[in-house]
Amino acid sequence: TFCSCETKYMYDKIPVAEAKSLNIEDFQPCCTTPLYDAMGMTLTSTHKHVQDMMDAMVVVTIITDGLENASCEYNGKTIKELVERLRGEGWTFTYMGANQNSVEVAMSMSIRNARNFDYSNEGTRASMQKDSSTRMNLFGRLAKWKTAEMKGCCGVLASESERRNLYANMADEAFDEEENK
């Protein structure tokens, strides 16, 4: 979590199996919102960590209760450029904002998938459930594709670039399907 008074990492590059569930207390905002700095630092660090991994799928979810108002190192232009570059590498992004026009904010950063939520326990819970359903949908699609690929029904194996684009498209389709439920 990032705020103008501190940066607190809940998890930093640990296996999913070792991560514990987060609760509402883990997301208590304070101070102001250096959203661009939070994104820039996290995305840059994650990119360094995964850049040499083969067949990596990177799914980024940005959750915020506020708009950018305190960044020092990154600005809207640099974040938009970073997101566009990473999307070109197959990364997928979801922006979830409380009590704001999340679609407009996300679009300003070249993020396709956006979701609004009410800043309340129920609003947060519902948004997290929807995001979880989206991820499960995505991983179901990925499992089917991987199974078909292993059985050789897909013909020639996809190149790394094709694979990353396929993963990003699967993520977008999963998001759209869950939004339309």
Pin down the residues of each PLM region.
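Acidic, low-complexity intrinsically disordered regions
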Residues: 1-181
